[in-house]
Design a protein with these regions (language model features):
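Phosphate/diphosphate ligand-binding glycine-rich loop within oxidoreductases
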Residues: 1-114, 230
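Helix N-cap at the beta1-alpha1 junction of Rossmann-like dinucleotide-binding domains, i.e.
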Residues: 10-12, 152-154, 222
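Short glycine-rich anion-binding loops that position phosphate/pyrophosphate groups of nucleotides
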Residues: 58, 62-67, 129-130, 193-196, ...
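Rossmann-like adenosine-cofactor binding region
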Residues: 169-239
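Conserved S-adenosyl-L-methionine
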Residues: 140-145, 234-236
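Glycine-rich adenosine-cofactor-binding loop
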Residues: 7, 100, 110, 118-143, ...
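Adenosine-phosphate binding glycine-rich loop
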Residues: 218-283
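Short helix-loop-beta connector
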Residues: 115-121, 210-211
Length: 283
């Protein structure tokens, strides 16, 4: 099974490792390659997608900054990708099929930590591809209210309008409101690249969370970001992007696999994968 990852600044990605591990667990040979595009060249990106399909790839994962752009090249867009207007997984059959396992992966990550408890007021930092997936996932979890901090006001307002179509309440805030909103919310979710090895920093700037917060960071390289370190320092519940990484990869592998794998069967390996990746990455 030939798979790949297309994105920018992705040399530290663990995607090849986890898909090969899953292949070994289910006795499916996996060849997984990284295609690190150095520029946001949309034409080059589209050429790469069609080239990999022609080369017999089963599918590819898509990451920053192409999760929204990729929908232009899909023949079939699944329901969640259509709703979110973003995709992180392409399946190559006769058609190119767009799926979104960031959405399902966040749902599973949240439920892993909180069960059936509905999210209270939540601050989401960043409204790009993964931000769109997570805000819609929070909506599916019946979040009380979302506060979106997105510096691109046009992008932020488009997301809010899209959420309103599904009766998901969201307010766009600016930096001047950030400190006040942090004090009012229960959850803080980072969907920006800030904190990644190639984008150092903290999306909260100089502001600090408190021990009343739960904090999730979609960045997992490094696994313990500046944001999570801030949360750990004050005693907040911190949730590493490792969980999203694992759950979205499990869902993607099920979609890629040409043999039938029972979801319950793959779920048996969650604890093993969490223990391994937290040991390797969470330092």
């Amino acid at each position: 099974m030939k798979l790949g990852l297309i994105g920018k600044n992705i040399q530290s990605s663990q995607a090849p490792d986890i898909h090969k591990r899953l292949g070994n667990l289910f006795k499916i040979p996996v060849n997984y390659q990284i295609f690190d595009l150095k520029e946001n060249d949309k034409n080059y990106f589209s050429d790469q997608v069609f080239r990999l399909k022609d080369r017999g790839f089963t599918g590819v994962n898509i990451t920053f900054p192409f999760k929204e752009e990729v929908l232009k090249y899909a023949d079939v867009i699944n329901e969640s990708s259509l709703m979110i207007k973003s995709s992180n997984t392409l399946i190559f059959k006769t058609d190119i099929i767009a799926e979104n396992t960031d959405y399902t992966g966040f749902l599973r990550s949240y439920e892993f930590h909180f069960g059936k408890i509905k999210p209270k007021k939540t601050l989401v930092l960043g409204g790009g591809g993964v931000g769109r997936s997570i805000t819609f996932a929070l909506g599916s979890l019946e979040v009380e209210h979302i506060y979106l901090y997105e510096t691109d006001k046009v992008k932020g307002n488009i997301l809010i309008q899209d959420l309103e179509l599904f009766k998901i309440n969201c307010t766009l805030i600016d930096y001047n409101q950030l400190k006040k909103i942090i004090s009012e919310v229960h959850g803080i979710v980072n969907c920006t690249p800030l904190g990644h090895y190639d984008f150092p920093g903290c999306p909260l700037g100089e502001f600090m969370p408190s021990n009343d917060h739960w904090i999730f960071d979609a960045v997992y390289t490094p696994a313990k970001t500046t944001l999570l370190k801030k949360g750990e320092k004050v005693g907040a519940k911190i949730i590493s992007g490792i969980d999203l990484f694992i759950f979205q990869a499990l869902d993607a592998f099920l979609l890629f696999s040409t043999q039938r794998i029972d979801k319950n069967e793959i779920s048996k390996h969650i604890q093993f994968l969490r223990e391994y990746y937290f040991k390797v990455l969470f330092k």
